[in-house]
Structure formats: C-alpha cells, structure tokens
Amino acid sequence: MAGNFWQSSHYLQWILDKQDLLKERQKDLKFLSEEEYWKLQIFFTNVIQALGEHLKLRQQVIATATVYFKRFYARYSLKSIDPVLMAPTCVFLASKVEEFGVVSNTRLIAATTSVLKTRFSYAFPKEFPYRMNHILECEFYLLELMDCCLIVYHPYRPLLQYVQDMGQEDVLLPLAWRIVNDTYRTDLCLLYPPFMIALACLHVACVVQQKDARQWFAELSVDMEKILEIIRVILKLYEQWKNFDERKEMATILSKMPKPKPPPNSEGEQGPNGSQNSSYSQS
C-alpha cells in the first residue's frame, strides 16, 4: 500500500473532474438515458459484489474491483469491452493486487457462470460466453488503461479512525460501513478522496442514528461543502434505488446498451486480433 494518498496515482491521476466524466460518457448516453446508465452502474456493481462474495473475497478486494471497473468505463464506452467480461476481469486483477491470492482460472469461470445463472438469470438467460483467454486479454487492456496504477485507497480505514475518535464505534460503524459499500454504486469513488467519502457516510449514519456530532464535525479542517455534495449524491442514490426494480428493468436496459460484436461459440474462440472479434470493439 502506498504510504501517502496525496502522492499516490489514485489522487494524482484518478480523482476526475465531474464535467470531464460526463463528457466521456456522451457516447453511451446516445443509447441510454442518464437514469438507465445509473441503473447499469448499480447493476454491475451488484454483479461484482455477488461474484466476490461467491469467491469469499474480502470487501476491500470487491471494492477495488469495482473501482477498476468504473475507471475503465470512465475512459471508454460500454461498447469497447462487454461489461459482462470486464466485471470478472476486475475481480481477477483486484484479488492479485490486494494480495488475496490468485483466483484459479477454473474457479473464476465456474463462479462467474454460477453467479450469472443463479443470481442474475433475469438479465442473462444465456450461458456466460467467455473463457479464460478472454479474461487475460481483457486484463491486458485494463492494465494498459490504468497505466498499471493499481493501488486504490478506500474510505474504510479513515472511517474506522473517525468512529474511534468519536467514541461511537459500536453504534455508528456498522451503518456507516454499509453506506460506504453503497457509495460504490455511484461515481463518488472517481470524484472525491476516500477520507471525504468516509466523513460523508459517517455524517449520514449520525443523522440516521440521531447522534449529535455537530461539534465533532465543526472541529475538522475539511471543506464541508464538498462533504455536503457527497451526502447529496448518497441521498439521491437511496431515493432512486428504492424505485429500481432490477428484475423487471434490467433486460430492457441491457438490450439498449451499446455492445461490441457478439461473442463466439465456446469452441474455437479467438481473441480480439482473430477473425472473431468477440468482446472488444476498436470503435
């Protein structure tokens, strides 16, 4: 783990400007509304979470995989690489970077196939069409895009420090931790430093648990306007999420999503440089 966030590639290269992020997204917003794009974000975060849990990965590994996924599509259209392939690729890479240990090829493909069939069959009625050669090639493109900047800082550690400083660990930590997990369904991890996200989640937890922490927050040397911006995004997430029926909506949204060329049959697959350019698009 790099010692200082302010000197890290996370801060120097991967805290993005919101307007630049929206500009990069315009290609996809020709096919999807902003609300549909947001629902895709929630959905694929759920896929990564379910896959990570199936593989018994730590939450930090799952969070890192989610950040990798978001970084890729912050720079490229959904059409460039199928998100159904990118999701397990991000899990595969994150498990190595976070020193959890390499998930074996067979186990990764079996887990992805099982999770999509049992948890997300309403969205993916067909078998998972990719094999390990696709994952490895996708990993190459992901590494290239991130320029091998693989260390990701998360809000979990600062959150622990803050609740301990408050002396409210038992009351606030479980709820604030869950709120941090939920923020990965938004763009917040691309836009704000993790310590600010931690403070915003803690603030929301204090309000929900009716803990008066105004004095504690007032003593912080932090831009509270930015904390309030993050809180507004969190509240908007919960407001929209409660009206989102994944089972009814996702098949239609996925059908509208811009896609690369169709995947090949499992026999005689070829990568993006072969005659069957399955999961990648150069456009």
UniProtKB/Swiss-Prot annotation:
Organism annotation: Mus musculus (Mouse)
GO cellular component, one term: mediator complex
Positions of disulphide bridges: none
Residues with Phosphoserine modification: S275
The family this protein is said to belong to: Belongs to the cyclin family. Cyclin C subfamily.
Transmembrane segments: none
UniProt-recorded name of the protein: Cyclin-C
Molecular function per GO: cyclin-dependent protein serine/threonine kinase regulator activity; identical protein binding
Region entry Disordered, spans: 252-283
Localization, UniProt: Nucleus
Lineage top rank: taxon: Eukaryota
Domain Cyclin N-terminal: 20-151
